[in-house]
Structure formats: structure tokens, C-alpha cells
Amino acid sequence: MHLLTGMYTAKVDEKGRLSLPSRLRAALSSEEVVVLPGLDGNHLMLMTPDYFENQFCVQIISTPLALMDKEKRQLMRKIISPAQYLDVDGAGRINIPQSQRDGVGIENKSECLLMGTGYAVEIWNPETFEKEDEECTESVSDLAQKIYEEEKN
């Protein structure tokens, strides 16, 4: 799988289907994807089943004792439980469940923003993303430095 990159706008049709841009379809190279709530609760994440099962979930359920940790159980309920496997149809569309779209303000016949973030695609209501982006006042350099310092320790 190639890294998922780029920013795209796409429209959800009257049946709730979202056409994936061709570059994202090629990078996903899968006939099935997983959609789940974003970690901030204001967008959705889309990833391959392989990445979801073998990387993403492994980070949350890192040990057999993970079920004994209250915070990990809560995270599993909020993120893993609502995850759904979706087929990519012959036209490159996915049908995101209404309940997941409602949770992040994406309606039928509305535009959404798709952002490749490496191993996942974030799906946003454009207005929500604009507000989120405005609230992030740190520069890219400052964010990178902060992450570097945290990883170093």
C-alpha cells in the first residue's frame, strides 16, 4: 500500500455514497475499507482492513491484559466497536452508514473533505475542518518539535 496523501473534495450522493478520488483508490488498493470515528470525534477515518487489524488495533490492544485496563476498554468501545467494513463498488464508491455520517455532520448531497494522512484518510465536514484548522495556532515547525521532544523522552 502506498501512503495516503492529498486533499480532495467529494460529494456524498442522495443514497449516501461517497466516490473515492482515483489517487486514493489506487493507494488503498483494496476492494474493502474500514470506516471508524476519528480520534477527535469530529471526523471519520478510512483505512485498509490490513492496517486497521494489524497496526491500528494492535496499538490499542497491545497486550492480553488490555481488557483489564479501563481506559483501553473505553477506547475500544468508542473507536473499534463502531468500525465498519465497507465494500468499494465498481465505480469506486463507498456507502458510509448514516449513523456515522450523522455523528460528524456529513449529509446526503453535501460536500466533504478527504485528507490523506499517511495510513488513513480523514473524512470531514468542510466547515468543521475549517474551525478545527483555525483553532490550531501552532506552526508546523512547533508541532514537529513538540512531537520530537516527546518521542525523545
Label the model's feature ranges.
Residues 1-10, 14-15, 23-86, 90-91, ...:
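Flexible "stalk/tail and boundary" regions
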